[in-house]
C-alpha cells in the first residue's frame, strides 16, 4: 500500500462539516485541524448540486468556493477512478457518486472519510468512519 497523502471527504461529510453538524466526529475534526491535506472532489460538487436541485438536501450554491476558503484542495478527476470502480463488487448497485469517490480516494492514495454504512462494511483499511 502506498503512503497516504491526505484525506478525501465524502459529499455528506463535507456538508456536515460546513454546517458544524454533530455527525462529524471529534477524531475527524482533529485530523482536519492537524494540517493534513484535505481534499474534495468535483464529483461532490456535482452530487450536492444535483441533490439540492431535486430537493433531497440543502447545499450552498457556492460549495466549491467555501471549501477552497477553508483551505481544502480540489482533487482532479482522471479516468483512473472511472475504471477502478470495478474493484468494489459489493457496490455494484450502489450510488455511482459514492463508488467513484471511493475509487478516486484510493487511486490518489488518500484516506476516505464517510458515514456510508455500505462502504464502511467493505472493510477497506483506507476507509474511515467519519462519525467515529
Where are these regions (language model features)?
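Active-site flanking residues adjacent to catalytic metal/cofactor-binding acidic residues
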Residues: 9, 46, 115
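Generic structural signal for small/hydrophobic residues in well-ordered secondary structure
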Residues: 10-12, 48, 78, 105
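ABC-type ATPase nucleotide-binding domain
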Residues: 51
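Helical cap/lid subdomains and adjacent loops of hydrolase enzymes that gate the active-site channel
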Residues: 32, 68-70, 85
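A generic structural signal for short hydrophobic patches within well-formed alpha-helices
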Residues: 14, 45, 82, 119-120
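An amphipathic alpha-helix/helix-turn recognition signal
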Residues: 6, 43, 99-100
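Short, well-structured N-terminal submotif of metal-dependent ribonuclease cores
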Residues: 1-40, 54-65, 108, 121-122, ...
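Active-site neighborhoods of divalent-metal-dependent phosphate/nucleic-acid chemistry enzymes
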Residues: 2, 60-61, 72-117, 125, ...
Amino acid at each position: 500500500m502506498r503512503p497516504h497523502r491526505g484525506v478525501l471527504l465524502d459529499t455528506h461529510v463535507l456538508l456536515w462539516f460546513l454546517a458544524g453538524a454533530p455527525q462529524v466526529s471529534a477524531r475527524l475534526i482533529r485530523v482536519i485541524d492537524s494540517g493534513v491535506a484535505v481534499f474534495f472532489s468535483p464529483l461532490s460538487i456535482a452530487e450536492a448540486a444535483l441533490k439540492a436541485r431535486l430537493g433531497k438536501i440543502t447545499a450552498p450554491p457556492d460549495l466549491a468556493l467555501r471549501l477552497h476558503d477553508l483551505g481544502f484542495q480540489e482533487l482532479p478527476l482522471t479516468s483512473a477512478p472511472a475504471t477502478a470502480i470495478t474493484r468494489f463488487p459489493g457496490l455494484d448497485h450502489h450510488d455511482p457518486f459514492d463508488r467513484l469517490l471511493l475509487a478516486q480516494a484510493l487511486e490518489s492514495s488518500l484516506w476516505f472519510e464517510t458515514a456510508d454504512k455500505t462502504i464502511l462494511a467493505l472493510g477497506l483499511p483506507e476507509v474511515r468512519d467519519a462519525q467515529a
